[in-house]
Amino acid sequence: KVIYHLESADVDLVRSAIPTHFAARLARRHVKAVLTGEGADELFAGYTYHHAYVDRPRELAEELTRSLNAMHNINLQRVDRITMGESLEARTPFLDRDLIDFAQSIPATLKLCRTDPSDREATGATTEKWILRKACADLLPHDLIWRKKAQFDEGSGTIDMLAQALAGLAGTNGPVDRAQESEIYRGILSAQYRNPERIFAHAGTWEAGRVEAA
């Protein structure tokens, strides 16, 4: 069901879509619309790979802009399609135009900071989204504000459930590598669409408001 609504066999996209699916299903029992946090990592340097830019603020700012411009093809695709698959409307307040403009005016050195791991206001030697965490320090519990970054599928625990399911589909007792995982997803997608090659041919080609020829 996740792959059907996602219309993608991308490994990372599918992995993150699974906890989104369960969260959307639970939320839809009670509400018709939810607020999500998409955009915060792209605006305030929230990904662990950003650590490589901690001493290169100009390059970090450029990378944040690049990832923000690519969101429609990754995280926003996941959130929009999976939530609508449960008839739930997801709204993204971090992507309000005025907030984007304000966030991009904040120096990159305040978003990703070198910190003392023993400090109460740190997640380690490098702290992501520092200024955003600081701004919310009086609004949310300390342990929540300063918890270490975890990918959605890891933090939710669905990555372990998925590993077991993939092993069953692959007919093995051991771990399934990324290439096998991708093939499993492509097989599931192919089984659900008459002409899946049309999806594969154009997946990921939306860029800068145009469709590139596959």
Where are the regions a protein language model picked out?
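Conserved S-adenosyl-L-methionine
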Residues: 141-151
